[in-house]
């Protein structure tokens, strides 16, 4: 009877973690360090719930980055940077439809594309105008909204990603995660802080440029800046 109760508590805990990630609330974040410790002490009965919780975290990461890339693409298009806009769109396709298709190689390529697009945008902002003709103000405002929303989602994952970084890769495998996703999870945990910092700088530059050009700045963009380091 005690064993049944303990198993029930573990399953309820894992279900609560998944629900917290899906809710998107700022304080609903995953402590994967505790998850790893529980797995080592709790045996295989927790494997499926734990796998689901980590899978939800990876899918949330994918969703945030797709939103960011959509924002970068809109900003680049607004500035006449067609090559950079296409690069952002291509990078979004690397992420597929969810965490089940992630690979370290795809994540590295996606991160490189984000950085390249950010650099192109930064150079365009510095020159004070679009590459061809006037700035498309509506597309720029839409890009700010998408980038701000993506970074808001991203910032809400930081606690969970930090816990992921402190979890031994062997524990991820014990949680039922396949080796490919376990490698991707470890890569994300290492690269996410620098990635967030770089994208926050891009959003800040874009907001400053919009203000100087009389472009409407969506509230989600300014709110995101307050959440970011």
Regions found by a protein language model. Give the residues of each.
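Bacterial N-terminal signal peptides
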Residues: 12-22
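Extended amphipathic alpha-helical interaction segments
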Residues: 107-227
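N-terminal Sec/ER secretory leader and immediately downstream segment
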Residues: 28-119
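Bacterial N-terminal signal peptides that target proteins for export
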Residues: 2-14
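Long, low-complexity, polar and repeat-rich extracellular regions
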Residues: 61, 228-229
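Sec/Tat signal peptide C-region and signal peptidase I cleavage site
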Residues: 22-28
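Solvent-exposed, non-transmembrane amphipathic alpha-helical segments
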Residues: 24, 81, 88, 92-95, ...
């Amino acid at each position: 009877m005690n064993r049944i109760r303990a198993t029930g508590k573990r399953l309820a805990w894992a279900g609560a973690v998944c629900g917290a990630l899906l809710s998107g609330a700022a304080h609903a974040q995953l402590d994967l360090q505790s998850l790893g410790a529980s797995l080592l002490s709790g045996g295989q009965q927790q494997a499926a719930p734990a796998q689901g919780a980590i899978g939800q975290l990876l899918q949330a990461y994918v969703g945030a980055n797709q939103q960011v890339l959509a924002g970068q693409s809109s900003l680049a298009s607004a500035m006449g940077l067609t090559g950079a806009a296409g690069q952002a769109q291509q990078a979004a396709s690397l992420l597929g439809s969810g965490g089940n298709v992630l690979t370290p190689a795809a994540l590295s390529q996606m991160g490189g594309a984000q950085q390249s697009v950010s650099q192109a945008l930064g150079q365009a902002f510095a020159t004070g105008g679009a590459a061809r003709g006037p700035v498309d103000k509506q597309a720029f405002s839409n890009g700010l909204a998408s980038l701000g929303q993506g970074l808001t989602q991203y910032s809400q994952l930081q606690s969970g990603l930090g816990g992921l970084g402190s979890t031994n890769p062997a524990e991820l495998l014990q949680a039922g995660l396949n080796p490919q996703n376990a490698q991707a999870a470890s890569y994300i945990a290492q690269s996410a802080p620098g990635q967030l910092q770089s994208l926050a700088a891009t959003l800040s530059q874009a907001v400053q440029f919009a203000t100087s050009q009389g472009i409407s700045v969506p509230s989600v963009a300014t709110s995101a800046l307050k959440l970011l380091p």
